[in-house]
Protein backbone atom coordinates (compact mmCIF):
# COMPACT_ATOMS: atom_id res chain seq x y z
CA UNK A 1 0.00 0.00 0.00
CA UNK A 2 1.34 3.37 -0.99
CA UNK A 3 0.66 6.62 0.81
CA UNK A 4 0.11 9.60 -1.46
CA UNK A 5 1.53 12.98 -0.54
CA UNK A 6 -2.01 14.00 0.46
CA UNK A 7 -2.25 10.91 2.71
CA UNK A 8 1.10 11.68 4.31
CA UNK A 9 0.15 15.27 5.00
CA UNK A 10 -3.13 14.23 6.64
CA UNK A 11 -1.41 11.57 8.76
CA UNK A 12 1.40 13.87 9.88
CA UNK A 13 -1.13 16.53 10.93
CA UNK A 14 -3.15 13.91 12.77
CA UNK A 15 -0.06 12.73 14.66
CA UNK A 16 0.01 15.86 16.82
CA UNK A 17 -3.68 15.50 17.69
CA UNK A 18 -3.19 11.85 18.59
CA UNK A 19 -0.25 12.74 20.83
CA UNK A 20 -2.25 15.48 22.58
CA UNK A 21 -5.17 13.11 23.24
CA UNK A 22 -3.26 9.85 23.63
CA UNK A 23 -4.65 8.74 26.98
CA UNK A 24 -8.33 9.46 26.32
CA UNK A 25 -8.38 8.23 22.73
CA UNK A 26 -6.18 5.23 23.48
CA UNK A 27 -8.39 4.17 26.39
CA UNK A 28 -11.50 4.58 24.25
CA UNK A 29 -10.09 2.54 21.36
CA UNK A 30 -8.80 -0.20 23.67
CA UNK A 31 -12.12 -0.40 25.55
CA UNK A 32 -13.90 -0.73 22.20
CA UNK A 33 -11.53 -3.55 21.26
CA UNK A 34 -12.23 -5.42 24.49
CA UNK A 35 -16.00 -4.96 24.16
CA UNK A 36 -16.24 -5.92 20.49
CA UNK A 37 -13.61 -8.67 20.57
CA UNK A 38 -13.52 -10.12 24.10
CA UNK A 39 -10.98 -12.75 23.06
CA UNK A 40 -8.36 -9.97 23.00
CA UNK A 41 -8.63 -9.67 26.79
CA UNK A 42 -6.50 -12.83 27.09
CA UNK A 43 -3.39 -10.75 26.33
CA UNK A 44 -4.15 -8.51 29.30
CA UNK A 45 -4.72 -11.01 32.09
CA UNK A 46 -3.26 -8.65 34.70
CA UNK A 47 -5.78 -5.91 33.97
CA UNK A 48 -8.34 -5.40 36.73
CA UNK A 49 -10.94 -4.10 34.27
CA UNK A 50 -11.47 -3.40 30.62
CA UNK A 51 -13.40 -0.13 30.59
CA UNK A 52 -11.98 3.16 29.30
CA UNK A 53 -11.92 4.55 32.85
CA UNK A 54 -9.62 1.75 34.10
CA UNK A 55 -6.11 3.05 34.87
CA UNK A 56 -4.41 0.07 33.19
CA UNK A 57 -6.49 0.57 30.05
CA UNK A 58 -5.64 4.29 30.06
CA UNK A 59 -1.94 3.57 30.49
CA UNK A 60 -1.73 0.98 27.72
CA UNK A 61 -4.00 2.98 25.42
CA UNK A 62 -1.76 6.00 25.88
CA UNK A 63 1.32 3.90 25.10
CA UNK A 64 -0.27 2.63 21.88
CA UNK A 65 -1.45 6.03 20.72
CA UNK A 66 1.91 7.63 21.48
CA UNK A 67 3.59 4.90 19.42
CA UNK A 68 1.19 5.63 16.56
CA UNK A 69 1.80 9.37 16.87
CA UNK A 70 5.55 8.74 16.73
CA UNK A 71 5.10 6.51 13.69
CA UNK A 72 3.44 9.38 11.83
CA UNK A 73 6.88 11.00 11.70
CA UNK A 74 8.47 7.91 10.11
CA UNK A 75 6.13 7.23 7.20
CA UNK A 76 8.99 6.61 4.78
CA UNK A 77 10.57 3.97 7.01
CA UNK A 78 7.84 2.35 9.09
CA UNK A 79 9.53 -1.04 8.88
CA UNK A 80 12.66 0.10 10.67
CA UNK A 81 10.74 2.33 13.08
CA UNK A 82 8.36 -0.47 14.16
CA UNK A 83 10.86 -3.32 14.08
CA UNK A 84 11.33 -3.56 17.86
CA UNK A 85 7.58 -3.41 18.51
CA UNK A 86 6.99 -6.08 15.88
CA UNK A 87 9.56 -8.34 17.49
CA UNK A 88 8.09 -7.78 20.96
CA UNK A 89 4.53 -8.55 19.85
CA UNK A 90 5.51 -11.44 17.60
CA UNK A 91 8.23 -13.20 19.59
CA UNK A 92 7.59 -12.28 23.23
CA UNK A 93 3.88 -11.51 23.58
CA UNK A 94 2.77 -13.88 20.78
CA UNK A 95 -0.10 -11.64 19.76
CA UNK A 96 -2.26 -13.02 16.96
CA UNK A 97 -1.54 -10.61 14.08
CA UNK A 98 -5.24 -10.46 13.17
CA UNK A 99 -5.73 -8.46 16.36
CA UNK A 100 -3.77 -5.55 14.89
CA UNK A 101 -6.48 -5.17 12.24
CA UNK A 102 -9.25 -5.44 14.82
CA UNK A 103 -7.61 -2.74 16.91
CA UNK A 104 -7.09 -0.56 13.84
CA UNK A 105 -10.84 -0.63 13.21
CA UNK A 106 -11.48 0.48 16.79
CA UNK A 107 -8.94 3.29 16.44
CA UNK A 108 -10.68 4.53 13.28
CA UNK A 109 -14.02 4.67 15.13
CA UNK A 110 -12.43 6.52 18.06
CA UNK A 111 -10.87 9.08 15.72
CA UNK A 112 -14.11 9.52 13.79
CA UNK A 113 -16.05 10.14 17.00
CA UNK A 114 -13.51 12.63 18.35
CA UNK A 115 -12.38 14.56 15.29
CA UNK A 116 -14.78 17.15 13.93
CA UNK A 117 -12.98 17.16 10.61
CA UNK A 118 -12.79 13.40 10.00
CA UNK A 119 -13.31 13.80 6.28
CA UNK A 120 -13.31 11.01 3.70
CA UNK A 121 -9.75 12.08 2.80
CA UNK A 122 -8.64 11.76 6.43
CA UNK A 123 -10.48 8.45 6.77
CA UNK A 124 -8.71 7.06 3.70
CA UNK A 125 -5.31 8.23 4.95
CA UNK A 126 -5.88 6.76 8.42
CA UNK A 127 -7.04 3.44 6.97
CA UNK A 128 -3.93 3.18 4.80
CA UNK A 129 -1.64 4.21 7.65
CA UNK A 130 -3.11 1.71 10.12
CA UNK A 131 -3.00 -1.03 7.48
CA UNK A 132 0.72 -0.34 6.99
CA UNK A 133 1.29 -0.33 10.76
CA UNK A 134 -0.56 -3.65 11.13
CA UNK A 135 1.50 -5.10 8.27
CA UNK A 136 4.77 -4.03 9.87
CA UNK A 137 3.74 -5.26 13.33
CA UNK A 138 3.02 -8.64 11.72
CA UNK A 139 6.47 -8.78 10.09
CA UNK A 140 7.92 -11.19 12.67
CA UNK A 141 5.28 -13.74 11.71
CA UNK A 142 6.36 -13.91 8.07
From Swiss-Prot:
<dbReference type="GO" id="GO:0042744">
    <property type="term" value="P:hydrogen peroxide catabolic process"/>
</dbReference>
<dbReference type="GO" id="GO:0005344">
    <property type="term" value="F:oxygen carrier activity"/>
</dbReference>
<dbReference type="InterPro" id="IPR000971">
    <property type="entry name" value="Globin"/>
</dbReference>
<comment type="similarity">
    <text>Belongs to the globin family.</text>
</comment>
<comment type="subunit">
    <text>Heterotetramer of two alpha chains and two beta chains.</text>
</comment>
<dbReference type="GO" id="GO:0004601">
    <property type="term" value="F:peroxidase activity"/>
</dbReference>
<dbReference type="InterPro" id="IPR012292">
    <property type="entry name" value="Globin/Proto"/>
</dbReference>
<keyword id="KW-0408">Iron</keyword>
<keyword id="KW-0813">Transport</keyword>
<dbReference type="GO" id="GO:0019825">
    <property type="term" value="F:oxygen binding"/>
</dbReference>
<dbReference type="GO" id="GO:0031838">
    <property type="term" value="C:haptoglobin-hemoglobin complex"/>
</dbReference>
<dbReference type="InterPro" id="IPR002338">
    <property type="entry name" value="Hemoglobin_a-typ"/>
</dbReference>
<dbReference type="GO" id="GO:0043177">
    <property type="term" value="F:organic acid binding"/>
</dbReference>
<keyword id="KW-0479">Metal-binding</keyword>
<dbReference type="GO" id="GO:0046872">
    <property type="term" value="F:metal ion binding"/>
</dbReference>
<feature type="binding site">
    <location>
        <position position="60"/>
    </location>
    <ligand>
        <name>O2</name>
    </ligand>
</feature>
<keyword id="KW-0561">Oxygen transport</keyword>
<comment type="function">
    <text>Involved in oxygen transport from gills to the various peripheral tissues.</text>
</comment>
<dbReference type="GO" id="GO:0020037">
    <property type="term" value="F:heme binding"/>
</dbReference>
<dbReference type="GO" id="GO:0005833">
    <property type="term" value="C:hemoglobin complex"/>
</dbReference>
<dbReference type="GO" id="GO:0031720">
    <property type="term" value="F:haptoglobin binding"/>
</dbReference>
<dbReference type="InterPro" id="IPR009050">
    <property type="entry name" value="Globin-like_sf"/>
</dbReference>
<dbReference type="GO" id="GO:0072562">
    <property type="term" value="C:blood microparticle"/>
</dbReference>
<keyword id="KW-0349">Heme</keyword>
<feature type="binding site" description="proximal binding residue">
    <location>
        <position position="89"/>
    </location>
    <ligand>
        <name>heme b</name>
    </ligand>
</feature>
<dbReference type="InterPro" id="IPR050056">
    <property type="entry name" value="Hemoglobin_oxygen_transport"/>
</dbReference>
<protein>
    <recommendedName>
        <fullName>Hemoglobin subunit alpha</fullName>
    </recommendedName>
</protein>
<dbReference type="Pfam" id="PF00042">
    <property type="entry name" value="Globin"/>
</dbReference>
<feature type="domain" description="Globin">
    <location>
        <begin position="2"/>
        <end position="142"/>
    </location>
</feature>
